[in-house]
Amino acid sequence: MKLVTADQMRQIEAAAFASGVTPEGLMETAGRGVAQAVATRLRGAPAQRVVVLVGPGNNGGDGLVAARHLYDMGAEVRVYLLTPRAVDDANLRALRERDDLDIVELDEAKIASELAPEVQHADAIIDAVLGIGRGRPLEGIFAAALDTLTQQRGLLLAVDLPSGLDADTGAVDPHCPAADVTLTFGYSKLGLHLLPGASHAGEVEVLDIGLDPALGADIDTEIMTADWARSALPGRPLNSNKGTFGRVMVVAGSQSYTGAATLCCLGALRAGAGLVTLAALPSVRAAVATLLPEVTYITLPEEDGVPAPDAASVVAGALPGYDVLLLGPGLGLSDGSQALVRGLLAAPAVKDLPVVIDADALNTLARFHAWHESLGTRAVLTPHPGEMARLSHSSVADVQSRRIELSRENAAAWGQTVVLKGSQTIVADPAGRTLISPFANPALATAGTGDVLAGSIAGLLGQGVEPFEAAGLGVYLHAAAAELYASEYGPSGLLASEVAAGIARAAARLRREG
């Protein structure tokens, strides 16, 4: 599903007007769409009592059009004007021509005596107060009227955006209502899918208002959906063998972090990789082999418990037989581990190979100037906010306040696909394409889940999925696996190994429901 900022939506509308679409016609289509969506949801309500809160500007105009169509459909409609409309407002005039349609010019004195009781007894309340043009804090009659919506028992539907929700950032005003449904026009707005805005948007339905699809051809930001993920899934032909589904080389783990190596391999296998080989120290190999008999091994030479100077050449010599390299989880930051990372990334065999770079490999790179110049052209970097801060010489606070912008900027600057992990993980590529995960699941906030994610992305790359799509699909399946767990057990207690098992279930569900 494509997402737009407020400015992008204004530009699309301006282009539509330049092509001959009229503002009045667009508003009529939008308001009629709102009315039809409300009526569809109220078919089981005998009285269909509808309250419409109308603000200034186009959002209020959409509400007036919706009120007219709902009245004409037989609903009992009451309209509350929070501010005076223009004397020549054609949509308001059309409402006044209809008998038994109450229009109340609201003031603060009427909120408790008139609006609040109506809100409590309505089958549906339409928030058509403020839309993408909001730029000020809610106060006065706007704040007081919207606060009554916390008392509603019927369905609360927002027109384009819940009033007080920032279309670009998802920030919400303290008086912003939590809608059951948001009926947004043309394209969904970015802020509806970013926390905390997503928690106020409810179900988001995009209404077709007749815009030429060509006007949105350049939109490069999407929210991941099941349909998108299904389209990215690699095929599983019947006439196949393990080589068909990719050979993954994993370089991970150390004496202190054997579990990281296990989880990476497990993630790759559960994502469908045909063969997974772990290149690791003898102690790591021994630990993983007891848990994963499906994995093959390359034993790294060691000195004093860390990779020896020739460890990188051992792995590089084997890489021509592999389709993807995963590097970093649990390696630690010893001199030997850092030399292994730098040596591998400098190896000619790696330059044209898809590489997933995670955890300690990222921390190693962050210590060197212009580190990204040593990479090939097909890397996927998977930092958490702390690692992103180190890589970009920023702070965690800055990373978290500019997750989308920083992901895009760094993907372009580094020439690689970037996966910024966290609640609603962001995936960006050098061309500016951006994917946003719809999932924010605290069950994933546990050790080892990032290792599983890195492994799953590597497993998908090995099956021939392109880096941007592999990163997005890996993120989606990883989070969907956690959702399956949380639906049964709640938001805590999930183990990283259970996420890996859930990846195969999530993929099967996509295929089954497609």
Predicted regions and their residues:
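Small-residue (G/A/S/T)-rich helix-start motifs and N-terminal tracts that mark the onset
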Residues: 1-82, 181, 192-359, 363-380, ...
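Short Asp/Glu-rich motifs
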Residues: 35, 88-90, 101, 115, ...
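Nucleotide and nucleotide-moiety/phosphate-recognizing core
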Residues: 36-129, 137-159, 346-351, 372, ...
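Short beta->alpha connector loops
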Residues: 84-85, 108-109, 163-165, 188-189, ...
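Internal gly/pro-rich beta-alpha loop/helix module
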Residues: 116, 122-124, 129-220
